[in-house]
């Protein structure tokens, strides 16, 4: 009886603290710093990766977009593996340290690739694949576990703070992204006074990314035992065997229960779905025909396996289904948002006037505005959610996410309108890309940290890291879709100029009013210029206006449908907001 009374007194004390103290645990700032350096590493590398592949490794833009999308997709597929290993064996802390070291090593191998391509391009390509593979698995160990630990910092009486906590955490993500997108292009994407790119400079950008990841890993290692702890002082994120009953909700099962039949059906489903997606994504590029089907098939399979757990209660099942539904819509957001690293970078490189404040900004650095805006607006957004919650007027998480999807549709509609009359030689003013990134930042702050918070609120603890992995898989599917959609970009001004230098009327070739000779086709192929317009669901993409309208329609429709589903999702969340 005394134990029950003491437990009740502790719970009441925590509730009173939650009402009167808005501050967050110091451990949040440790995770903030660790994630900041990891995002420096990731986004810094991302800013120069496709440019390195195209300019140094002599890959086609379409192929580099597919590789980029596949790489990002796998980076958000492996968190399922990292989440599973963490929940069952290693714990959050060990997985974060392992993942950080792996990513630092991967970036160092990219440094090696960018150092040897001039004398041995095949070795450089091999090192590229090795590096990306190591980074993919390192990210898988790191990403779901640090997000899961943010959620674990708050006892159940303080879960209402998670939207604000993840928005602050997201500010760290984007501070790191800003620094990475500033420093890595400055040292790695260098042009001389004549505008000629130094294709041997990319290595310094990759080296900077590796050093940043080592700093982030060291920060976590040194500070984790002092600050990443429960309110009672117990370390968070240790080995799963060290969990105690207080770590779980009342009546919550502490272990998942999968029947042999469920596991067998999961294997069969994965194989069947792989071949279905392989058929739907027919082509010659192995990224598109092997990696993308694996991402989609494994995501659906694991989602089905989790809800087959016999220990799930009705409330837990409904909440997990909300995570799945929201994840589906977030896929369309990332498919549009992640054009930043592929098609938007190519447009910034080839068809944008980047002259700003008397300086020609490198194309890989244009993405930096997103990081600047997130860092500037994340804290005001967190204050906004706090004030609305205090007045009991805070929108439901799914409404915030529908607003985010709607905003990204608006951003692409504006850019589509401004490229409509560019023609083959006009330049887009950089102010329009800056406006696009501003609106997309508002969209991101309404959607991404809120999604992370929602997973933290709705996940049963025994599935916490794994469900973050599943949630990140929606990002993976979005990134894979981003790669496929990014490859739809039609010929930009530089392609028409190069074709003209070769004596070829590219516009006439694309319009099919002139039949190119075999020699002309060979010249176009050699110079990485397509002789036909890209196709999307049976429609030909003739220009940048049509290209950007694809994203307007995808995200606009997704926003409307998610908003209409909100009453049903509210009911399924069973009191969670």
Regions found by a protein language model. Give the residues of each.
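A membrane-interface helix-boundary motif in multi-pass transporters
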Residues: 186-211, 279-291, 393-399, 428, ...
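Glycine-rich segments within core transmembrane alpha-helices of 12-TM secondary carriers
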Residues: 74-75, 161-189, 205-216, 367-374, ...
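C-terminal ends and interior cores of transmembrane alpha-helices
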Residues: 98-123, 401-425
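Cytoplasmic membrane-interface "Motif A"-like loop-to-helix N-cap segments
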Residues: 88-103, 157, 387-408, 427
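Short amphipathic helix-loop junctions that connect adjacent transmembrane helices
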Residues: 47-67, 189, 288, 340-366
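Central cavity-lining transmembrane alpha-helices of secondary-active solute carriers
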Residues: 69-88, 104, 143, 178-180, ...
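Hydrophobic core of transmembrane alpha-helices in multi-pass small-molecule transporters
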Residues: 36, 106, 119-145, 327, ...
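Intracellular loop-helix junctions on the cytosolic face of multi-pass helical membrane proteins
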Residues: 1-26, 156-157, 188-345, 350-355, ...
